[in-house]
């Protein structure tokens, strides 16, 4: 059932009585997840990532935590690993490529457009592509991260709406946070404002509305990019919190919002060499962005990148001869 709405004092911004729900991966359907995302903005899916996959990905990534990256936007007690596709095939194929995550991203981020080429009409439906990926290790003493919307870098300006009016195309990015360790309020769990994806993007965050995204190892948190969120302080005595995050973005722009910049947040084309791209499955090569978007955006020498680099498989937009 959709959450009830009340008007704020200025009569402009709906205040959504939303919540953070936990669903079991063994019983939940894709339609269930879509419903919770539309109405609440985020949802925890328990037991989505197996122990075997976490061990494989951890063996690839965790050694890099010792090679510290300058924290930048993050606390000095936060260690981050970047360029994950260049460090872990398993991360790309089994976490970023998780079928539930990909199906959810397809639903919210796939564009649909019709256009004419001469006397023939075509329908274009380019799928979303990789936006970013990071691994986080937060240590005791880690500071609170400011609340923010993931889509702010794409200048995604949105009006307030009711949950039943949520249109596909409103969000430009969608993310998944994977718990490698138990994640609690005390050791730095993500703070999340349920329903904030329905607010105007001009509204500031209200810390009093946050809830901690507490998870066990193997659980994931799926979140629309217009939701306010941010890491909590790690006030535990000795607990390290390890989290993998990855986001996908629309590969083209629909005019449902006044988004001005739609580029991938992480420049994967400089961080992942072509020889590394060849190692991935054709499906993941496309999802990482090494493929033309339907009908033929992202070409090299007016050809699909797959042909230029002799990558296997066909792209989505090869039906128009340019």
UniProtKB/Swiss-Prot annotation:
Domain of life of the organism encoding this protein: Eukaryota
Keyword Iron: yes
Stored InterPro entries: Phytyl_CoA_dOase-like (IPR008775)
A single MF term (Gene Ontology): metal ion binding
Positions annotated to bind Fe cation: 148, 229
Pathway: Secondary metabolite biosynthesis
GO biological process: biosynthetic process
Alphabetic keyword roster: Dioxygenase, Iron, Metal-binding, Oxidoreductase
UniProt-listed Enzyme Commission number(s): 1.14.11.-
Enzyme class at the top of the EC tree: oxidoreductase
The keyword rRNA processing appears for this protein: no
Family to which the UniProt record says this protein belongs: Belongs to the PhyH family.
Function (record text): Polyketide synthase-nonribosomal peptide synthetase; part of the him gene cluster that mediates the biosynthesis of himeic acid A, a ubiquitin-activating enzyme (E1) inhibitor. First, himA, together with the trans-enoyl reductase himH, catalyzes the formation of apolyketide chain, which is then condensed with leucine by the NRPS activity of himA. Dieckmann cyclization and release from himA gives a tetramic acid intermediate as the product of himA PKS-NRPS. HimG then catalyzes alpha-oxidation of the tetramic acid ring, with a subsequent rearrangement to yield apyrone intermediate.
SUBUNIT field: Homodimer.
Name of the protein in question: Dioxygenase himG
Organism lineage string: Eukaryota, Fungi, Dikarya, Ascomycota, Pezizomycotina
């Amino acid at each position: 059932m959709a959450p009830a709405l009340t008007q704020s004092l200025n009569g402009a911004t709906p205040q959504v009585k939303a919540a953070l729900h936990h669903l079991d991966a063994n019983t939940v359907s894709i339609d269930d997840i879509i419903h919770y995302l539309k109405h609440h903005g985020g949802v925890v899916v328990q037991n989505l990532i197996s122990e075997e996959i976490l061990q494989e990905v951890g063996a690839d990534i965790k050694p890099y935590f010792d090679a510290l990256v300058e924290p930048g936007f993050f606390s000095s007690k936060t260690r981050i690993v970047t360029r994950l596709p260049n460090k872990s095939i398993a991360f790309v194929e089994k976490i970023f490529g998780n079928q539930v995550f990909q199906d959810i991203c397809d639903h919210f981020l796939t564009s649909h457009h019709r256009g004419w080429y001469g006397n023939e009409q075509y329908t274009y439906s380019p799928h979303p592509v990789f936006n970013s990926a990071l691994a986080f290790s937060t240590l005791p003493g880690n500071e609170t991260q400011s609340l923010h919307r993931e889509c702010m870098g794409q200048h995604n300006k949105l009006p307030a709406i009711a949950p039943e009016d949520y249109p596909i195309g409103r969000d430009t990015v969608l993310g998944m946070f994977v718990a490698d360790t138990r994640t609690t309020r005390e050791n730095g769990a993500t703070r999340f404002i349920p329903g904030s994806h329905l607010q105007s993007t001009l509204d500031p965050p209200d810390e009093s509305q946050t809830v901690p995204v507490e998870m066990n190892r193997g659980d994931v948190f799926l979140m629309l990019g217009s939701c306010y969120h941010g890491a909590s302080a790690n006030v535990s005595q000795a607990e390290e919190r390890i989290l993998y995050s990855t986001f996908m973005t629309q590969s083209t722009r629909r005019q449902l919002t006044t988004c001005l910049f739609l580029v991938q947040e992480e420049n994967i084309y400089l961080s992942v060499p072509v020889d590394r791209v060849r190692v991935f499955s054709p499906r993941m090569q496309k999802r990482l962005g090494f493929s033309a978007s339907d009908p033929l955006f992202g070409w090299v020498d007016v050809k699909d990148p797959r042909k230029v680099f002799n990558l296997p498989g066909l792209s989505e937009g090869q039906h128009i001869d340019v």
